[in-house]
Swiss-Prot record:
Residues 580-914 form the Protein kinase domain. One of its GO terms (biological process) is regulation of bone resorption. Its EC number is 2.7.10.1. It comes from Rattus norvegicus. This is Macrophage colony-stimulating factor 1 receptor.
Amino acid sequence: MELGPPLVLLLATVWHGQGAPVIEPSGPELVVEPGETVTLRCVSNGSVEWDGPISPYWTLDPESPGSTLTTRNATFKNTGTYRCTELEDPMAGSTTIHLYVKDPAHSWNLLAQEVTVVEGQEAVLPCLITDPALKDSVSLMREGGRQVLRKTVYFFSAWRGFIIRKAKVLDSNTYVCKTMVNGRESTSTGIWLKVNRVHPEPPQIKLEPSKLVRIRGEAAQIVCSATNAEVGFNVILKRGDTKLEIPLNSDFQDNYYKKVRALSLNAVDFQDAGIYSCVASNDVGTRTATMNFQVVESAYLNLTSEQSLLQEVSVGDSLILTVHADAYPSIQHYNWTYLGPFFEDQRKLEFITQRAIYRYTFKLFLNRVKASEAGQYFLMAQNKAGWNNLTFELTLRYPPEVSVTWMPVNGSDVLFCDVSGYPQPSVTWMECRGHTDRCDEAQALQVWNDTHPEVLSQKPFDKVIIQSQLPIGTLKHNMTYFCKTHNSVGNSSQYFRAVSLGQSKQLPDESLFTPVVVACMSVMSLLVLLLLLLLYKYKQKPKYQVRWKIIERYEGNSYTFIDPTQLPYNEKWEFPRNNLQFGKTLGAGAFGKVVEATAFGLGKEDAVLKVAVKMLKSTAHADEKEALMSELKIMSHLGQHENIVNLLGACTHGGPVLVITEYCCYGDLLNFLRRKAEAMLGPSLSPGQDSEGDSSYKNIHLEKKYVRRDSGFSSQGVDTYVEMRPVSTSSSDSFFKQDLDKEPSRPLELWDLLHFSSQVAQGMAFLASKNCIHRDVAARNVLLTSGHVAKIGDFGLARDIMNDSNYVVKGNARLPVKWMAPESILYCVYTVQSDVWSYGILLWEIFSLGLNPYPGILVNNKFYKLVKDGYQMAQPVFAPKNIYSIMQSCWDLEPTRRPTFQQICFLLQEQARLERRDQDYANLPSSGGSSGSDSGGGSSGGSSSEPEEESSSEHLACCEPGDIAQPLLQPNNYQFAC
């Protein structure tokens, strides 16, 4: 069934509409009490500017300069009208909000003590009432209690003050504003009004915007306006030397005559570009303003730097890396990244962004640079033109470090001078008589300049290590040999003294010495290699980490996440571990297990509740224990929601950490769908199926010899750590009997699939409202409980990530690549919008009844290119056209064009309502048909075609034993080793 035109129009407005800026909180007026914290936020498509009684009582948010105003202690002086204007688009206009700060002790807020106008103008006396309830009792008096002149025409505006129409010279005076508060008169201080006689001058002009860029075919507007106290003036708009014939609009505002010529272009072309001039003239003179209008073929994003991309500084110096970006449309995401090679002891990167019209300045601050901070620094930015980047290479300069050693070589004495530093130091040898600590060329008996020392090491961004040899034959009595080194950073030297022949040395027997040294060096080399191998294996071993991330703040694509270890833990969650009676192990993985348990007295003193308990292995490392504690803190921070697996309690004292969560009796959604698939053979819902598709679902159970543990809620029956592996037939049978006894035997309806989809979307909308990014949205991570309620969870403890084909090795992480958005795969960017992409894959899983996404496609470079080029899977068999449209919108390559979870909820609920009404509870068909061999991704339905199958073993992978037993992935950050 199709979405009606009104619904489509609504979505187009939500996703792509542009208009005036929006001020939050909404409403034309806001009334607060003194001392309250007030925050005004302006939401717009571009740069904004605030106008009103701002300084010094307000602060601008440094993380979003210009868009957010905050005052921590509101006073009557904050009363006034605040206007937010978008700088880059005059068509968008502006939005205002008026703030009242009710202060019984101060009924008036004066914005000025003196007002000067020209005769005939409107004179505004800016005494603002602080309480809107007092505006009915206001009055205006002259100083000394005298009445206002009878011929003076004035009125009161709560937003502006008292306004005198067409002020005359005789109106010059000091005025006071009065009102009644609780029966008493409250008077403002005086405002001096000075009315000057008119002096003719050229018109004042304004040309907006000051600069304009549009893509060919877009709309644009250029506004040329002029004002003057006299009506006799003219205004024209020119492009180059050509006068444009544009209608003239006239108005009279604030005692000034205003004339406007507005050029509106519905679809700009290259001939519309050029220099535009706004010219206004009268008998007194002429004023002119100009602006540049640029029309481009497509969106652009250019990154440049006035600095060299190859930077060299000394250790301990500070450096600012600056990049300028010229972009249209606005940049949506950006981030600075350190690309190595030294990843140990890295500080958090500090940077700021300065915005102007169509231009950005990104600055990265490197303060007191350490040796480990040398390397590549990468700025990545994105707008509708795509991604662009700029890379700086920072090399540190080191002064020379020198070491002199002696060693016999072939019976001859040789001195070795080992030097490290950058730039490569020069080496000079000197021989001086006697035992001395200093020697220069004047004192030296001999001087050798080694112009070609041996380079031992020359790694990028590191010191150069060289060695110079001085063969001297036989060491001379009472001589000192100096090795002096120098580079642009500094110099260093070391000496070697030769003593008398009788004392000099007892040279070891070279025939014995050399083999011993070689043997020792060989053993040491083997030990070092073994140590490096063990270290590499340890680094490659995945660690249990917290998957969910809470955003603290963001600017562009620069996210600051809350450190979960710093979140407070509320002791109200503490539950006596003695009140837990453990049952069978529900699932186990590399890091821990999930155990069924009965909790006595949880919530109520006499309550008995079945729960699921997460715990670590006894061999868990300290960082894994910290990760589980962080997960506990995040769950408590998020709060409760019907569609997430909620925290019920925890045991953190007197033993290992235990996290108590809700128990979900039907297991994970993926296996639930696969179990139900045998009864859903759907000729009425799945047109065009062929006979081959029958096998797609008949083989799903594979004689029930494999049991999935990835949800953490399947039955094993013994309280041991169980890896994800095939189990015996008897064990499998008991599992299906136990869980399927609780499952309703009726076949699924289309409404059920819509119900699951809507509930997951509601859970994701809740997480998004809490600034939480999930990063592994998939059917295997959704559990079902009583009433077929779907809950989103985090089950990393019950996963053997090393053996799950759904997770692909990328760098030092295992990633669910087929569920990931392109920006996450290619650029390590994770946002709520990337969760929306993953949700689209989950929808495909639901409406294909548990098939693996991208069937028949291996995860390799060809897969990455397909995703990057916009390839989309075909419409699943059981998905109505409108549901497939939602999937496609979730898979938009431009993240900002993807729907929000709130919009997805609305669409799914509307579809479910229509399904209830039109299908009259029609079940999915239960006999006779087949699902179609291409049900999960055959022909791509019009715009794209299915790629050629690369591996038969990958086709319909849900039918393979290894896939049925696949475990879930350890919760990690899912970031590449960038």
